[in-house]
Amino acid sequence: MSDFYVRYYSGHHGRFGHEFLEFDYHSDGLARYANNSNYRNDSLIRKEMFVSELVLKEVQRIVDDSEIIKESDESWPPENKDGKQELEIRMNGKHIMFETCKLGSLADVQNSDDPEGLKVFYYLIQDLKALCFSLISLNFKLRPVKN
């Protein structure tokens, strides 16, 4: 798993500046999360933690099972006024990067030129976000047990 890396970014430049959500997993177990929103003067939220090899294997399994590596973003909608999404994956000797506009719902996916490929991307992102949010929530809410 020495060449494993996954990074997701979703963001835009709007009236509140550069707002984005980004997270990544590294082969050494480092997992990072950043969320920047200037709405109501919110500030940048950054979280870092180390996850076990088992968690990394689960992330890799999720990516493998999605078969996203077989897809191409050539026919996907490009970045627009609502922003963009990026997914970068390095695993099994392959390095691939996808970029498309922000997708609000499955209707956006179905109305695209490549609904099947974009559906793979859409559901993979949902799975990766759910895992990331769960890990962040658990890691920063748990308190060590005192003897």
From Swiss-Prot:
An example GO BP is: mRNA cis splicing, via spliceosome
GO cellular component terms, semicolon-separated: cytosol; exon-exon junction complex; nucleus
- Which compartment or compartments is the protein found in? Cytoplasm; Nucleus
Pfam families to which the protein is assigned, alphabetical: Mago_nashi
Per its UniProt entry, which superkingdom is the organism in?
Answer: Eukaryota
Identify the keywords attached in UniProt to this record, alphabetized: Cytoplasm, Nucleus
- Signal peptide positions (record): none
Family membership? Belongs to the mago nashi family.
Designated name of the protein: Protein mago nashi homolog
